[in-house]
């Protein structure tokens, strides 16, 4: 992604997200409200985590919906719902809010924060995949 020709604003966003991922905490611009009434506090610091096989299975199950067709009941999977389910499970915490976030909390994010979080998780996944690729195929030297 570093090699793409991005406009100045996109490059700045990319660079800030990369730096924040490397530091371990992503900052939301607008924040996520926690609490009710006068006790509501905005939460800004997002900690991400790697998805597990269990997370993937749970996200897939949550993305499926039973619909009736001419031939009878059919399970249909929604790719957009799958993406949201994976996103919410990848969030370890937002401030004092422990993950995975509920869909109700995801809906409370501003558009800017939602897009920032989506980009960050995508970049985080790419970084994890790249590190796995670098490790792959390396064999420790064994004395003979």
Curated annotation (Swiss-Prot):
Localization: Host cytoplasm
Induction of the gene: Expressed in the late phase of the viral replicative cycle. Expression of late genes is activated by the viral late transcription activator C.
GO cellular component: host cell cytoplasm
UniProt key word tRNA-binding: no
Keywords: Host cytoplasm, Late protein, Viral release from host cell, Viral tail assembly
Entry keyword Transmembrane: no
Family in the record: Belongs to the mulikevirus tail assembly protein family.
Protein name in the entry: Probable tail assembly protein gp41
